[in-house]
């Protein structure tokens, strides 16, 4: 039991006074020497007490007044002994913060408060009139600005005179719209509540005290406050940026043309212009162009949009009339869409392709020359007669893209991102993994530059001044999540960590978008209605599982038992994912054997993606895990059925895709391992291996050059291995890991953790 803090209630004040007057200074000085770090963290008011003025009294201009209780005791509603540190803080080991100023008796007169309300009401009236003139039909802007909070509380603001002759010291008027923000936006209090009984300390603290100091300290603070407001009086919306030399937006964003006053008007006012001569030819308003006074049409509603070809084609030799281009694009959308090309939304691209061909597609939001050639480079590979043009299209797109990306004056566009991803898949099909990785990484960098992972309303593009329609917002969402799936698929195939992440995006989910009339030539003729949104959402979930377990299974250096534990967890999670799929996306052995369903590329791509994920994770552990071996054998049987049905349905594999290409490659590698493990079933493995080898090396080539490249690399590796066997006896390899060990020891010493293992 500790002794009571106050032995005698009657002697409490005398004891404190005597103890503080005799021993306070020496005790504080000794405690200062003992713990200097604690003293530095105390408030400036406590420093005044330590100077020897007395713990229970404070001197201010010759007058002596009693010190207040410390902050901790006031918050806990405990009696403070007015010591320093007080008994309660000492017992609880808290920092004793002394309040050196009593604000409870400092009150402002009702006359002064009324004058503030009158002044703000007059400002709100002027602001309301200004907003109604600029935006006559937009009541939402007034609601967002909260104009009228004080004005509505006053019976007649015009009769209240503004008089600041009160004896109360003048205070700066906060630059807020009807709301006081105290500290860091944690507490808000309407101005109209000032005619009620409020705590006077609020008026002399928080925003008043802070802004008074800021306004009096420097003129720069006042200028900064004005610059932070738009001409309409709203606070400027800052984009979500991190520490950067370019905090106001992307690095390369520059408008191509100076913004004129006409381009700042709403779209309705531009289209309603009665005098076409007021607009010069070629004036750009974002990505919509005023040509001879007519605003180029945008996608207002996909449900009512119709693509009519030939209306704006004055030149029969234009790119959208080239039969080779049309056939290549038809192959692209018939056989490869959606798949890993979800990011090239078909309806918006074709709308721009057929309607915005003038000015070389410079004014189209979702179509560009480099994107057309990139898509044609991919689509032309699926027709033997057009394969010779594939490299030509690729070089044209590549040359244009590199000029755009590495030109400081160019503007980041979403079509640039789409084209770079198309070239990445083109290079992967040729077996150039390095170039494919470079192009995909460049696409993501350009996308980040325009903020494509953020809300589609705040993308840094040239159409920021035009209000986007709901369909355009949904198209942008579809493009981003398509890029997300493309990035994760490429990283899965190349064994890299993905770049795009769900946690770093504020993009809303992609909704189902309708098919537009006029795109029949670019659709796969099947018996099922195309659905993209639902499969896309579930692929995002699957990619998230892959992202989580990739680091645990393939990156972190753990023993094989720990990796197998993570692998079993991953297999169970993916199994649960498949079982939880909606009925439309579920499949079984019966559905796989159905020729109409399993050969439909708009449906089977979802299955191939699942199989590729399972094979990629289980292939390295076939020798170590019975579960992995069983999973691989079951998947190989399903893939054999799918590929066999595709060959029987269409007669060949010239219209195959990368999903089929990589699934064949994974199946071949798995079968080679199974031959080593189960030598008793050699005949079965050899038969299946011949099946996949035939499709991979003879059927999918020459549409894809990857099989040929792998065959050449295998022969080259065999020659190099033979040469190394003859030279290995004469080579001494010296590996110096001293720096690595030194860094590991330093990390262990600083953070108290051990490194996974030493090399």
Curated annotation (Swiss-Prot):
Motif annotated as 9aaTAD, chain positions: 744-752
Ranges of biased composition (kind: Low complexity): 30-51
Keywords in alphabetical order: Activator, DNA-binding, Metal-binding, Nucleus, Phosphoprotein, Transcription, Transcription regulation, Zinc
GO cellular component: cell cortex of cell tip; nucleus
DNA-binding region as annotated in the record: 70-96
Job of this protein: TY1 element enhancer binding protein. Binds to the DNA sequence 5'-TCGGTGGTATTATTCCGA-3'.
Pfam family, one: Zn_clus
GO biological process entries: transcription elongation by RNA polymerase II
CDD domains, alphabetized: fungal_TF_MHR, GAL4
Protein name: TY1 enhancer activator
Locations listed in the record: Nucleus
Domain topic, free-text comment: The 9aaTAD motif is a transactivation domain present in a large number of yeast and animal transcription factors.
Note: Present with 736 molecules/cell in log phase SD medium.
